[in-house]
Amino acid sequence: MASSGAGVTAAGSANEAPEIPDNVGDWLRGVYRFATDRNDFRRNLILNLGLFAAGVWLARNLSDIDLMAPQPGV
């Protein structure tokens, strides 16, 4: 009886492990479909807002660099 209980728990834990790759696979499949759907307004909006935010971040963080200043050690 104890051996059958151990078998069930081992099988249960063995069955739980593949669920994570399935969920990750479903998530990756959804991301791929979302990224490759050319007629999706939400994708275009999110992508454009993300690119805009990245551009604003770069402009704000790289504007402090003075490219004409003499470089140390040169």
Curated annotation (Swiss-Prot):
Its main location: mitochondrion. It is found in: Mitochondrion outer membrane. It comes from Bos taurus. GO terms for biological process: protein transport. Forms part of the preprotein translocase complex of the outer mitochondrial membrane (TOM complex) which consists of at least 7 different proteins (TOMM5, TOMM6, TOMM7, TOMM20, TOMM22, TOMM40 and TOMM70). Residues 1-24 are annotated as: Disordered. Coiled coil: none annotated. GO terms for cellular component: mitochondrial outer membrane translocase complex; mitochondrion. Keywords: Acetylation, Membrane, Mitochondrion, Mitochondrion outer membrane, Protein transport, Transport. This is Mitochondrial import receptor subunit TOM6 homolog. Belongs to the Tom6 family. The modification N-acetylalanine is found at residue 2.
